[in-house]
A protein has these predicted regions:
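Glycine-rich NAD(P)-binding loop of the Rossmann-fold in SDR/ketoreductase-type enzymes
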Residues: 1, 32-44, 77-80, 88-91
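NAD(P)H-binding glycine-rich loop region in Rossmannoid oxidoreductase-like domains
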Residues: 1-40
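SDR active-site strand-loop-helix element
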Residues: 18-22, 57-63, 107-109
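Conserved Rossmann-fold NAD(P)-dependent oxidoreductase catalytic core, especially the SDR/UDP-sugar
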Residues: 46-83
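NAD(P)-dependent short-chain dehydrogenase/reductase
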Residues: 95-141, 145-147
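Mid/C-terminal beta-alpha module of Rossmann-like enzyme folds, strongest
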Residues: 151-198, 202-203
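C-terminal amphipathic/interface module of NAD(P)-dependent oxidoreductases
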Residues: 186-188, 193-230
């Protein structure tokens, strides 16, 4: 899509708020097709920003902007350092959209999950695994999609800027998965793999404005309960 097409869609919508979630989010795909990634992950949000005068624009970014950070985290908004094309494009998107629309909100989202999804996510991957699972000593947040939706009214009221957005954790992905299998009564096995770069975030900035999430383990338990899985 080009700028004129985006402008027409926005004008015809008569929307007061635009929430942009679309992306090419597969890191490997972005590495293989950087031009497509740039169009989807940078140019389209910029086109939206150009067409959003007088409207509140909310764009989903990614925790991948922290992939190259040298410290162990958890990471604050001012510590971004991408290490792949997807993360670099998301960071450029944030900067360019905010330059055009300073009141817009950039949400650095985590890996999201739900029991109903057309594509794999943490919850479904673990529930449907047929072989031994392997997770490294990596600290990262994963977020229940329902809590994302529940927070959107508060997100709309956020001052313009960049916000870490999702569940916080004090457990590694291996520890989380081990606990997840225990509470579901699964006989599936999980083994600890090699250490992987952390992606956990400090979400205190958003929390100061009332945008709060369950911790990672509590979010998983809530999701399992909501769908009658425990």
């Amino acid at each position: 899509m080009n700028q004129e097409q985006i402008k027409r869609i926005v004008e015809e919508s008569e929307a007061d708020v635009i929430i942009h979630t679309a992306a090419i989010s597969d890191v490997g795909t972005c590495e293989k097709t950087p031009e497509a990634s740039y169009h989807a992950n940078v140019l389209l949000p910029v086109y939206l920003a150009n067409a959003s005068d007088g409207r509140k624009l909310i764009c989903f970014s990614s925790d991948q902007v922290y992939r190259g950070c040298e410290s162990d985290g958890p990471y604050r908004e001012d510590e971004a350092k991408p290490a792949n094309i997807y993360g670099a494009h998301k960071l450029e998107m944030e900067q360019r959209v905010l330059d055009r629309q300073p009141d817009s909100v950039m949400l650095r989202a985590e890996w999201m999950y739900d029991d109903i999804s057309p594509r794999g996510n943490y919850l479904l991957n673990v529930l449907n695994a047929e072989e031994t699972l392997t997770f490294g000593k990596q600290y990262r947040g994963i977020t229940y999609l329902r809590e994302v939706c529940e927070n959107m009214e508060r997100v709309i009221k956020l001052p313009g800027g960049v916000y870490n957005f999702g569940s916080e954790t004090t457990q590694s992905m291996y520890e989380i998965t081990k606990e997840f299998l225990r509470i579901t009564g699964s006989r599936q096995q999980v083994q600890e793999g090699s250490a992987v770069h952390n992606l956990w975030m400090d979400c205190g900035k958003a929390a100061e404005h009332g945008v709060v999430f369950s911790g990672v383990m509590d979010g998983l338990k809530r999701c399992l309960g909501d769908y009658g899985l425990i």
